[in-house]
Amino acid sequence: KHLAGVGVAFKLAQALAAETGLPKSVVNRTLDLVGIGTIGDIVPLVDENRTLAKYGIRAINVSQRLGLVKLMEGVSLDKGAVSSENISYIIVPHLNASGRMENAGIAAGLMMGNDQEKVSQGVNKLIACNTERKKIQSDTFEICKSLVEERYKDDYFLVLDLEDAHEGITGIVAGKIKETYNKPAVIVTPTGEDCLKGTGRSIEGVNIYDL
């Protein structure tokens, strides 16, 4: 019941392969991506998730997937020695950065690509997106901290209205604000349609949907 979306997709692929007689080896070629998705989705690493993560890490360390190999080279990871921490804190943020800052298709294309030049361009783009993401995230976090200190320090529930926040990083920043002040935190931004769009993170024992 704890499977990440990628785990569900993998189980479906296994079932379809069994039904159609497709060799297991074909489905198992995706284990590197399954490992990245399982670890990156921060699901509990128990039961089947633990198995998928374990074999996913093994697959990553021997992967022939050109985009993944070049990404690991680009971020100075040694193929053969990649750990779950490397996946969580280096590989996943770079893959997510394209979706946060521009277009998730950049990362998807990289993982499917076989053209050396296009793959190199994709890696450079992901690294640039992640650098930009970290800068914007850091700046936004400092703005939020200032708002809390100036206006909302005594509030039990932090709701921060930011006009110019990049919505690709508001969830991360809300999480950091929650951790910093140990209070539920919501960041809202205008949608351009006379509405506000919000993302929130809560502390243990407080269901944000019930408030």
Where are these regions (language model features)?
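Alpha-helical scaffold elements that line and support the substrate/ligand-binding pocket
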Residues: 12-16
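Hydrophobic, small-residue-rich alpha-helical packing segments that form membrane-like cores
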Residues: 1-8, 18, 25-26
